[in-house]
UniProtKB/Swiss-Prot annotation:
Its main location: nucleus. It comes from Danio rerio (Zebrafish). Residues 3-316 are annotated as: Histone deacetylase. It is found in: Nucleus; Chromosome; Cytoplasm, Cytosol. GO terms for cellular component: chromosome; cytoplasm; cytosol; nucleus; transcription repressor complex. InterPro entries: HDAC_PDAC, His_deacetylse, His_deacetylse_1, His_deacetylse_dom, His_deacetylse_dom_sf, Ureohydrolase_dom_sf. It holds the Pfam family Hist_deacetyl. Its EC number is 3.5.1.98, 3.5.1.-. It catalyses: N(6)-acetyl-L-lysyl-[histone] + H2O = L-lysyl-[histone] + acetate; N(6)-acetyl-L-lysyl-[protein] + H2O = L-lysyl-[protein] + acetate; N(6)-(2E)-butenoyl-L-lysyl-[protein] + H2O = (2E)-2-butenoate + L-lysyl-[protein]; N(6)-(2-hydroxyisobutanoyl)-L-lysyl-[protein] + H2O = 2-hydroxy-2-methylpropanoate + L-lysyl-[protein]. The active site is at 135. The keyword Transcription regulation applies. The gene is hdac3. This is Histone deacetylase 3. One of its GO terms (molecular function) is chromatin binding.
């Protein structure tokens, strides 16, 4: 197959609900996927229904007690887990909701399968917009995140890759990933985020640089309110180029939190969808194996626009600014475009002097790095997941005709003659 981009999507992942009034909306994943379909971008990718991560997979990073708790707790029995809820920081921002463990299993499994396919050179780019939940810690939930799919995926990548670079463009600091790899030079973490004024999670000062073997392999770029495309570009591109030149990663993981866009419900930056996408395109340009993940993003319609646009950049396909008609078309009113104006009146508090100070400090830290730390040759551990699924029929075994026929629902998406959603069927 000539196409080297793998796209992972579970049709049920958008049906989970954190609860009334909660800003995290998994439904944004359904909107994103719908646009990917209706723009025809799926034709440019290998599309996979992903593996579901097991408890064992999650315990590669998280504690067994914590994962066991996530599997057992539910809205119906949570009164019996009062002590555990406090211990594991579940409740409030990280609520117990129906299907919590199942949700974690689905988004984590997709990221893990993406890492495995990169390891086996099945693809050059793997995309999982459901992943990127970067705040989860070893022993607890944090910031709407329960299982840290990023850390688990990087651990899988490290079986084959001596050096993995992690880049985070979410408005919130990637604290869970930084903490996991703070003491090692095998993973370099680079986070661009809002810092100061008690903004969550309160970490990510530029003087947090790593420790022990990981000293100077942790890079933080703390930003102030209102940063725009031009200011962000002037920092992002030279910093990432320098990091790649110094560190020489053999694989990159890119967390594309869309809460750094202007007009985000929880954000205070002023990036446009094109400006956010420029970062993705710049990282892709290094032609290094790349795992692309979602993350934050709380104005649902703009998250879907952003990740759809970035999918188009990753597969190098130009798409129209006019959105295609889909079942979620009304979400994108009143303009129905891919690139609406998302700028706000928030003043850009990142002065030229401030940006220059950050750049100089970051480059000073980079000079302290050992170029491309090496790893001793060793046996490669077995893959964390197997591609043989016991619940799926053997494709080599011919079954009866009835196994291959099914009713075709009128509201389902089909490519070709089976598509019921003809232009004549809809009134706009």
């Amino acid at each position: 197959m000539t196409n080297r981009t793998a796209y992972f999507y579970d049709p049920d992942v958008g049906n989970f609900h954190y609860g009334a009034g909660h800003p995290m909306k998994p439904h944004r994943l359904s909107l994103t996927h719908s646009l990917v379909l209706h723009y025809g971008l799926y034709k440019k990718m290998m599309v996979f229904k992903p593996y579901k991560a097991s408890q064992h997979d999650m315990c590669r990073f998280h504690s067994e007690d914590y994962i066991d708790f996530l599997q057992k707790v539910s809205p119906n029995n949570m009164q019996g887990f009062t002590k555990s809820l406090n211990t594991f920081n579940v409740g409030g921002d990280c609520p117990v909701f129906p299907g919590l463990f199942e949700f974690c299993s689905r988004y984590t499994g997709a990221s893990l399968q993406g890492a495995t396919q990169l390891n086996h050179k099945i693809c050059d780019i793997a995309i999982n917009w459901a992943g990127g939940l970067h705040h989860a810690k070893k022993f607890e939930a944090s910031g709407f995140c329960y299982v840290n799919d990023i850390v688990i995926s990087i651990l899988e990548l490290l079986k084959y890759h001596p050096r993995v670079l992690y880049i985070d463009i979410d408005i919130h600091h990637g604290d869970g990933v930084q903490e996991a790899f703070y003491l090692t030079d095998r993973v370099m973490t680079v986070s661009f985020h809002k810092y100061g004024n008690y903004f969550f999670p309160g970490t990510g000062d530029m003087y947090e640089v790593g420790a022990e073997s990981g000293r100077y392999y942790c890079l933080n770029v703390p930003l102030r309110d209102g940063i725009d495309d031009q200011s962000y570009r002037q920092l992002f591109q030279p910093v990432i180029k320098q990091v790649v030149d110094f560190y020489q990663p053999t694989c990159i993981v890119l967390q594309c939190g869309a809460d750094s866009l202007g007009c985000d419900r929880l954000g205070c930056f002023n990036l446009s969808i094109r400006g956010h996408g420029e970062c993705v395109e710049f990282v892709k340009g290094f032609k290094i194996p790349l795992l692309v993940l979602g993350g934050g993003g709380y104005t649902v319609r703009n998250v879907a626009r952003c990740w759809t646009f970035e999918t188009s950049l990753l597969v190098e396909e130009s798409i129209s600014d006019e959105l295609p008609y889909s079942e979620y078309f009304e979400y994108f009113a009143p303009d129905f475009t891919l690139h609406p104006d998302v700028s706000t009146r928030i003043e850009n508090q990142n002065s030229r002097q401030y940006l220059e100070q950050i750049r100089q400090t970051v480059f000073e830290n980079l000079k302290m790095l050992n170029h491309a730390p090496s790893v001793q040759i060793r046996d490669v551990p077995s893959d964390l997941l197997s591609y043989e699924r016991p619940d799926e029929a053997d494709p080599e075994e011919r079954g009866s005709e009835e196994n291959f026929s099914r009713p075709e629902a009128a509201n389902e998406f089909y490519d070709g003659d089976h598509d019921h959603d003809k232009e004549s069927d809809v009134e706009i």
